[in-house]
Amino acid sequence: MVSLGGFARKLFGSANDRRVRGYKGRVDAINALEAEMKALSDEALAAKTAEFRRELADGKTLDDILVPAFAVVREAALRVLGLRPFDVQLIGGMILHERAIAEMKTGEGKTLVATLPVYLNALAGKGVHVVTVNDYLAQRDAGMMGRIYGFLGMTTGVIVHGLSDEQRRDAYACDVTYATNNELGFDYLRDNMKYERGQMVQRGHFFAIVDEVDSILVDEARTPLIISGPLDDRSDLYNTINEFIPLLSPEDYEIDEKQRSANFSEEGTEKLENMLREAGLLKGESLYDIENVAIVHHVNNALKAHKLFTRDKDYIVRNGEIVIIDEFTGRMMPGRRYSEGQHQALEAKEKVQIQPENQTLASITFQNYFRMYDKLAGMTGTAATEAEEFGNIYGLEVLEVPTNLPIKRIDEDDEVYRTVGEKFKAIIDEIKSAHERGQPMLVGTTSIEKSELLADMLKKSGFSKFQVLNARYHEQEAYIVAQAGVPGAVTIATNMAGRGTDIQLGGNPDMRIQQELADVEPGPEREAREKAIREEVQKLKEKALAAGGLYVLATERHESRRIDNQLRGRSGRQGDPGRSKFYLSLQDDLMRIFGSDRMDGMLQKLGLKEGEAIVHPWINKALERAQKKVEARNFDIRKNLLKYDDVLNDQRKVIFEQRIELMDAESVTDTVTDMRNEVIEEIVAKRIPERAYAEKWDAEGLKADVQQYFNLDLPIAEWVAEEGIAEDDIRERITAAVDKAAAERAERFGPEIMQYVERSVVLQTLDHLWREHIVNLDHLRSVIGFRGYAQRDPLQEYKSEAFELFQALLGNLRQAVTAQLMRVELVREAPEEPQPLPPMQAHHIDPLTGEDDFAQAGETLLAVAPANRDPADPSTWGKVARNEACPCGSGKKYKHCHGIYEA
């Protein structure tokens, strides 16, 4: 029976259908210009770019020139690449231009679609960023699509790992820049650690089109980009605590797989306290005393490492290092590390070398990075299931773009078995059957462990004609994917999200030519062999089509419907036939976590025998409900985390904007003077209470404050003892003395050096305090949840206390800058041997090295006389030579102590 809503949709079409139909008028207008564009010479077509820019300068908007601009790009794509965007691709381009997400199925040409809005928006001259998930795709797409932009007189840049700042600056200066989300985010963070505007590489955030937008803005949303520097070595502590966990019994802890949490029971806590006490690590009586906060953190990490993290599923051990596996894509993520000591706990568990923990120097989430853009859009094959999240968090509407040809793929109902063993036996039989009939097959698994288990089982059954595609062998993945459509091919793959390479029936001729003819010089022989390869691939395609097209067989459901849909979407590209099917068991993770007990009892009552499966649409619906629950929970987590992160983000924006203002200003003398005057106001107000008699004034305290902040020995007690002296008189005398001392120092330095000194001190002090502030907010965030037990809203408490911490940061900044500038002196230092900078690490990428901000040998350096340095306050140290003893009194050289934090 058709519901009333279903009947209305049939009659009028869905809201999505109506929106898509609304683009038809402009599509017709673009098509009407096709003959006119074809008649233009290459030079005349390229000259359209300058013409459009003149029109924009004369007051037209991008919307006004959309139709002719799209027509120009379509013709250029045909001439340069031999590809003519279909009408549905024009619609996709318009959706992207209008700040929305275009959901386009696999094989529908998203890469080509992006060229339409990219060209249009690049005409504004502010730069357009096209965001991909890895360096390979960024280079591939920039190389291919850059030919279109180049033909039309535009420049194309690409940002990949390993480029110098100068190369990055040049790439960002181009009309169009292709880059990964990681590189963009880290360049932004690094830019806001620079000390001169000219050193920055990015030029703003105008328009970004994010490819695989669901992967970047949903799956990666919870992971912050972090640039960090090393802390002291604590490997002994990690190893000691790691030895305790295997000594515990199952009743000593509680594991919640749904929430990914692990906690000690009362019995476990008692055992742990005894072990810690024997090891001399426990302070006081209880593990949960305030002085044991750090130890609690370490033991919790060790428990999670042993009970929540699984080798070959969550991470692998390669070359003596723990390498994280992306749960959504199955890719290795070298260089990326779990934060807050969790990675070190895993290293202790696996008995590999423990790398030092890091202090966060700068961080931002993808959510907040991409929300900085004036205009944001995205493309993916699967976004509809996350439409609410895109709307709520990013203000992005999701529109499904119709396929150019109808989808012929058949999505079959799931087969559910009672045990994993029965399921895999059925899968092996199905793989052999598909191979015998010549049907190419993609077998999807949820982890490396599962893919290798299946591979071993296939070998034991006597079948070895398969390829394995997972994070262990990602170097070969492009070639394996390219040939996965050959008749009879069997490809076992971890989650295929973000692979970026289509599976073409018959194989990919271009990839084969690249591989097989790499050493063949251009000429008649190469042309003949290329032709032969293309003809062979065409015959293989016809054979694969006759066998039913690509067969996607999934061995398990993922907790996200979107990942399942991505796997299904590998089959049936561009109107090809295909089929997809999920083989499940009640022992699968999703089934086990979300109530398979009732289903198991029901299947037993139905008399299901060993090796038999149940196939029913009801099973699919029940699983979909379970997946929706997980998705809703994950969305709530991300939404809640964003509320907390927004607090830090608002403060980050203030600090970063302030840094840029300081770098852009001709002089920061007025800012420094204001800071100095505010410090005077603060110390006078603190030591001379309002309306208090002179006898109540704290003359000694005020004298000490003046000495601490202004490096002056003033006769405060004598002033206070004067007859009829007022608070304003004291303030004015201090101000006059301080201004005089500051003016004398400025005269000694000269205006040019003084401006450099002031700017350097303000920026370096701001950075130092900001890093400390980030750590303080992290600590606050880790404990704020307990306020809920006192019937207080943790988020409101966090906002309130974070604001107080920020106010304290600004107060500390005024005091530290003032104290340092009143002590700084010019000295000459002997030339020093070049020293390598300490490593900083950026999660997601390999360790980076910052630019050398130290002065070159023989230049004038700024230093504070040792007698004027406060060991407890780094802001009073000024410039410290790297081989000098650290002013903190540790006895170490500065470069091995506090100097390691200098970026």
From Swiss-Prot:
This is Protein translocase subunit SecA. Its cofactor is Zn(2+). SUPFAM superfamilies: Helical scaffold and wing domains of SecA, P-loop containing nucleoside triphosphate hydrolases, Pre-protein crosslinking domain of SecA. GO terms for biological process: intracellular protein transmembrane transport; protein import; protein targeting; protein transport by the Sec complex. It is a peripheral membrane protein. PROSITE patterns: SECA, SECA_MOTOR_DEAD. It catalyses: ATP + H2O + cellular proteinSide 1 = ADP + phosphate + cellular proteinSide 2. The keyword Transport applies. Keywords: ATP-binding, Cell inner membrane, Cell membrane, Cytoplasm, Membrane, Metal-binding, Nucleotide-binding, Protein transport, Translocase, Translocation, Transport, Zinc. The keyword Plastid does not apply. Part of the Sec protein translocase complex. Interacts with the SecYEG preprotein conducting channel. Has a central role in coupling the hydrolysis of ATP to the transfer of proteins into and across the cell membrane, serving both as a receptor for the preprotein-SecB complex and as an ATP-driven molecular motor driving the stepwise translocation of polypeptide chains across the membrane. May bind 1 zinc ion per subunit. Zn(2+) binds at residues 886, 888, 897-898. Its main location: membrane.
